[in-house]
Amino acid sequence: MDFEAIKKAAQGYRADMSRFLRDMIAIPSESCEEEGVVMRIKAEMEKLGYDKVEIDKLGNVIGWMGTGDKIIAIDSHIDTVGIGNINNWEADPYKGYETEDIIYGRGGSDQEGGMASATYGVKIMKDLNLIPEGYKLMVVGSVQEEDCDGMCWQSIVNEYFNGPEDARSKIEFVISTEPTDGGIYRGHRGRMEIRVDMHGVSCHGSAPERGDNAIHKMAEVLLNVRDLNENDAGDDKEVKGLVKMLDPKYNPEHWEDARFLGRGTCTTSQIFYTSPSRCAVADSCSISIDRRMTAGETYQSCLKEIEDLPACKKYAKDVKVSMYMYDRPSWTGHVYETEAFFPTWINKETAPHVQALVDAHHALWGTERIGADEKAMSTRTGRPLTDKWTFSTNGVSIQGRYGIPCVGFGPGAESQAHAPNEITWKQDLVTCAALYAAVPGLYHPENKDGSATSFRQELTGNDIK
């Protein structure tokens, strides 16, 4: 493989990738509103000579290159979060701007930059005849990730393919182009969205003893939730902290993976109440909990932890603990209902699909993370090349739910995600496009031994019909 030719080709497309990314940034594309950016991506793929470009029923845009039966997929979510307070932005977040080195605007790092690199990385494969015999590339611009990570791939697996077994038999592995700060990422923590409902009885506020104040009871739950996140796991603690999963005593099978991924966390993210008036005792109170899960935790264990909090047991007859559902229509109007559960996943560093990216990076760019400038390198220097994300990605479904091998390498920085004045680096676009182009030829499926996955959370089995 001529790695210098790959680098030269990627550098030659630097201006095209930058223009393509600027065009995507200029089209507002929050979750469920991605139609405009989908059409822009479709047009770019068609211009570049993709063999087939299609839009599935959920609204994901899918480009194909090659004629083989085995699939290597590259995924980029093309929706973005909103801009938040416009006063926090130094320039128009959609009009954006560019310098010699950076591109500014919402979605640059998270993560339309990944779409630009993937689209052109596969074009380089075609230009240089790098697609191995028997393979084809599937480039996915996926929707609604910011709203419900992985739901787009649930739809792809179950509605585009004929279910998990069919998808697993056809897809060798998936590269996620989420930002990785120059690293190759082999997993991340999972998450779930938990709801706690507390029942009370209203009465006139002048005689509160006649009622049963749901807010007061929920206040005790809130303190317990804080304890669950902040406490250690000492025997003297009534509520043992989530840090316990880093200890082989509490997590004998997966404590090493948990230490790699980081401990689980929980925080109260929303609170709601009902009351007849401001002069009455509240008759209900509900909270949302953002729960991040590490290796060894399951959705059942996380729900039970909340149910077993002292305050929840104290008010057991008035408490309901549940998991949120997601059923928001996509930009096409299609609804794919699913639970707000996003499974943890990790690969072994020796897995052949991970090793293909490592080998490509070593051949193209060396053994260390690279970046265009001091700001980029501030989050890269000294970190291992192979690592993990802090946030969540579509990998929660690709590998977490369905066991399709997944690995990450993408332009930009995690710290830029959801932040005002978001930027990405043009050199990252080049770096990633070159690596994507090299990977298929360095993948050795004969090294698969069925043990790539270190940890993959079980499915819920919920009937959501």
What function would you assign to each model-found segment?
Residues 2-104, 127-134, 413:
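Acidic/His- and Gly-rich active-site-bordering loop/insert found
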Residues 5, 179, 195-465:
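Metal-dependent amide/peptide-bond hydrolase catalytic core
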Residues 41, 115-125, 153-156, 218-221, ...:
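Buried hydrophobic packing segments
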Residues 71-73, 103, 170-176, 193-195, ...:
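Short glycine-aspartate micro-motif
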Residues 84-97, 189-193, 332-337:
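Short, flexible, mixed-charge acidic loops at enzyme active sites
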Residues 88, 130-131, 185-191, 278-282, ...:
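Short glycine/proline-enriched loop/turn "hinge" motifs that connect secondary-structure elements
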Residues 99-101, 121-138, 163-168, 225-236, ...:
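Phosphate-handling active-site elements
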Residues 111-193, 258:
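Acidic/histidine-rich catalytic neighborhood of metal-dependent amide-processing enzymes
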